[in-house]
């Protein structure tokens, strides 16, 4: 009997604890790894918001030694990863805990890679290049969108080259994720919009990815339903913990989908754009999403129709072209409703930047699972549309 190996699908995820207040149990999970000393990774904003103090209190309450590393930029950098790994080694740590958004969590993943391998993080760009297990890793997200807390991705900025690069490996999936919607209560409207759009794009791209399958589709669809149906309300009612929980759950579902199905051209192009101009990742996604959807539609019309129906669009009696336009219009209206109106030109992107951006986008692993095969010229055209 012959089997089509291209149809096989894997699914990796951390141990997930979801619910308000679960962050306070972090010490219980740290103890299961025989922690000698914990490297606690965060950033100045999360530290000021008070969430780090909760983690410190949990560790101190059970007599667990730790040291704190907060030298993390909004887009974590190579030097920050390398300095963090040196700090990890010099302090004699053997467990890593990160509390924060995607930046501290990605930095923590990078620190674990370098600590385990003893080499520069730059050497691990690409897919499945890790050969040594990382130290035990516990992640506590304080934003609802990046899904670094459940994914097998690490995104790091190389400032020398003005680009972001990806490390993709199941070795960077955290051991434990404590997903506590209370930690998102300090997010401002812009950050809520950025991370929410990111999560929505994760779900859309995972559903139409060439790596999609029955293990990821339910997560992607539920993520789209939760985020599309609740993000605008949540931004308008930032203290509503029930809405926060729905968006946090949507982010988690989107993360489980894209971590296993991978992504597409929106993220390949966003990584290039964000690395070049150091822009917020969600803002880049918002600028590009409807243009990439319009470009990709012909390659997966039935799956895009399911997305449209998930957003509540009545597709009965519509042609493919009409469904495509309704979906694009919905995405534009949605991003406007959460506060994204500006063109890329207002953020410093010019037509002369497009060849550079496109070359790097074509080298991103996410482009490999885009539903429509793309040339550099295709990517250049799409980059030009939101200017």
Residue locations for each model-derived region?
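Glycine-rich phosphate/pyrophosphate-binding beta-alpha loops
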Residues: 145, 252-285, 364-368
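Carboxylate- and glycine-rich phosphate/diphosphate-binding segment that chelates Mg2+/Mn2+
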Residues: 57, 153-261
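N-terminal small/polar loop signature for handling phosphorylated ligands or for N-terminal nucleophile
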Residues: 47-119, 233-244
């Amino acid at each position: 009997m012959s089997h089509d190996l291209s149809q096989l699908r894997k699914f990796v995820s951390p141990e997930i604890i979801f619910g308000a207040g679960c962050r306070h149990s972090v010490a219980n999970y740290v103890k299961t790894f025989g922690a000698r000393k914990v490297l606690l990774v965060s950033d100045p904003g999360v530290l000021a918001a008070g969430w780090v103090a909760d983690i410190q209190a949990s560790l101190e309450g059970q007599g667990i030694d730790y040291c704190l590393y907060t030298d993390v930029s909004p887009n974590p950098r190579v030097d920050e990863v390398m300095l963090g790994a040196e700090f990890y080694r010099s302090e004699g740590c053997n467990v890593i805990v990160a509390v924060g958004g995607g930046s501290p969590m990605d930095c923590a993943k990078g620190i674990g890679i370098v600590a385990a391998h003893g080499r520069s993080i730059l050497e691990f760009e690409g897919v499945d290049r890790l050969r040594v297990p990382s130290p035990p890793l516990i992640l506590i997200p304080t934003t609802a969108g990046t899904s670094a807390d459940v994914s097998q991705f690490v995104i790091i900025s190389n400032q020398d080259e003005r680009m972001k690069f990806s490390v993709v490996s199941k070795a960077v999936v955290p051991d434990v994720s404590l997903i506590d919607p209370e930690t998102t209560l300090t997010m401002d409207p812009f950050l809520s919009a950025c991370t929410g759009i990111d999560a929505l794009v994760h779900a859309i791209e995972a559903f139409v990815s060439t790596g999609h399958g029955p293990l990821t589709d339910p997560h992607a669809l539920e993520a789209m339903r939760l985020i599309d149906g609740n993000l605008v309300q949540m931004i308008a009612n930032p203290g509503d913990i029930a809405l926060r929980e729905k968006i946090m759950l949507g982010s988690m579902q989107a993360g489980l989908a894209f971590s296993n199905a991978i992504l597409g051209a929106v993220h390949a192009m966003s990584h290039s754009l964000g690395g070049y101009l150091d822009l917020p990742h969600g803002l880049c996604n918002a600028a590009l999403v409807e243009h990439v959807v319009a470009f990709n539609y012909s390659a997966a019309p039935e799956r895009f129709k399911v997305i449209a129906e998930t957003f509540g669009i009545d597709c009965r009696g519509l042609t493919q072209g009409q469904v495509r336009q309704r979906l694009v219009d919905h995405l534009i209206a949605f991003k406007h409703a959460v506060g994204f109106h500006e063109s890329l030109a207002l953020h410093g992107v010019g037509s002369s930047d497009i060849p550079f951006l496109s070359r790097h986008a074509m080298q991103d692993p996410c482009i490999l699972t885009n539903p429509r095969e793309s040339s550099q010229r295709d990517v250049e055209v799409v980059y030009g549309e939101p200017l």
